[in-house]
Amino acid sequence: VSPFKASNLSSSWYMTGSGAPVGVGQAFQAFASGIAPDADMGPFILKPENGKVIRYLRGRPCDLSVEESVSEALSSFDSLSGRYDLVVCEGSGSPAELNLKGSDIANMRMVRERDIPAVIVGDIERGGVFAAIYGTWKLMPEEERRHLRGFIINRFRGDISVLNPGIEELESMTGMRCF
């Protein structure tokens, strides 16, 4: 199993054995999977520097078009897919940010390009988890929803029965399972 995140906003990175950086999160996930971190696990790193965000591709500053960026991200994903039985793709932020639809390479673009099954993960600690999950689902066009396999509510602690009415309503409204 290999982690993958096409684009990662991070102020630090981990240097791989080949000398190319990868996001610290992807390095940690790789170690947890028992494999060595690889730059293909996170080809793009957006690093805040001096009040700006500098975009790096495998450790080198870059200024690529969206299509060139997608091509690079797909190349990294394909490389990992050829070496591992399973590649777990992590998105970045929300897959339904209307203002970023045309330039987002880390979320549904990867899913659509490689027909990757997806789940929406909602963070209960931020509050409004059912509204966030349902709103995200509702904003997604049907061509993207067809890739969804369900929802996950993250960071819940306590008696799960407290969530059951909300889970049942969410599943009824969307026809999708909440895991």
Regions found by a protein language model. Name each.
Residues V1-F179:
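Flexible phosphate-sensing "switch/lid" loops adjacent to ATP/NTP-binding sites
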